[in-house]
Amino acid sequence: MDIAIQHPWFKRALGPFYPSRLFDQFFGEGLFEYDLLPFLSSTISPYYRQSLFRSVLDSGISEVRSDRDKFVIFLDVKHFSPEDLTVKVQEDFVEIHGKHNERQDDHGYISREFHRRYRLPSNVDQSALSCSLSADGMLTFSGPKVTSGMDAGHSERAIPVSREEKPSSAPSS
C-alpha cells in the first residue's frame, strides 16, 4: 500500500515564502543576516530558505521569455568572462556552458563550472541568433521568431558571445 507523505500544515501554508533549497546556486556567495537567524531557518526546516531578499536574476537562475516575435534567455554569469563561456545551438536546443579554472579570490582558490540546456521554440530563426554579455554579468541569448510559413533551419553551430559595456536592461522580476 502506497502512503502519500505530506509536509506538516505549516510548511504547506508557508511554502511560497520558503522555497526548496534543492536547487540553490549560491555557492561561495556568503551568508546574509537572515541566513543566521535560527528561528527562521531551523524551526521551519533546514531544507527551506527565505528568498524574499534576493531577486531571481541576481541568484544565478535564468529567465526565459518567449513572446510573439522573439525568444530571449537571461542568465546571470557574473563570475565568467566571454572567453569562459561557450554557447552553441544543436537542433532544437541551445547549450550554454561556462567554466573557469581555479583562480584566487578573497577567501582562497575557487573554480566554477555550469551547463544549461534550453529547448528552442520550433519557429525561432536560428540563422539570426545572438548572444551578448553585459558589463554587470548578464548573458542575453535572443532570436527572432519567423512566420509560420518559413523554415527555421536546424543545424549545429556555435554562437559567439559579445561583450557590452553597459549593464543589462533585464528586469529584476
Swiss-Prot record:
Keywords: Acetylation, Chaperone, Cytoplasm, Eye lens protein, Glycoprotein, Metal-binding, Methylation, Nucleus, Phosphoprotein, Zinc. Residues 153-167 have a biased composition (Basic and acidic residues). InterPro entries: A-crystallin/Hsp20_dom, Alpha-crystallin/HSP_16, Alpha-crystallin/sHSP_animal, Alpha-crystallin_N, HSP20-like_chaperone. GO terms for biological process: lens development in camera-type eye; negative regulation of apoptotic process; protein refolding; response to heat. Residues 52-162 form the sHSP domain. The modification Phosphoserine is found at S45, S122. Glycans are attached at S162. The modification N-acetylmethionine is found at M1. The gene is CRYAA. This is Alpha-crystallin A chain. It comes from Phocoena phocoena (Harbor porpoise). Residues 144-173 are annotated as: Disordered. Heteromer composed of three CRYAA and one CRYAB subunits. Inter-subunit bridging via zinc ions enhances stability, which is crucial as there is no protein turn over in the lens. Can also form homodimers and homotetramers (dimers of dimers) which serve as the building blocks of homooligomers. Within homooligomers, the zinc-binding motif is created from residues of 3 different molecules. His-100 and Glu-102 from one molecule are ligands of the zinc ion, and His-107 and His-154 residues from additional molecules complete the site with tetrahedral coordination geometry.
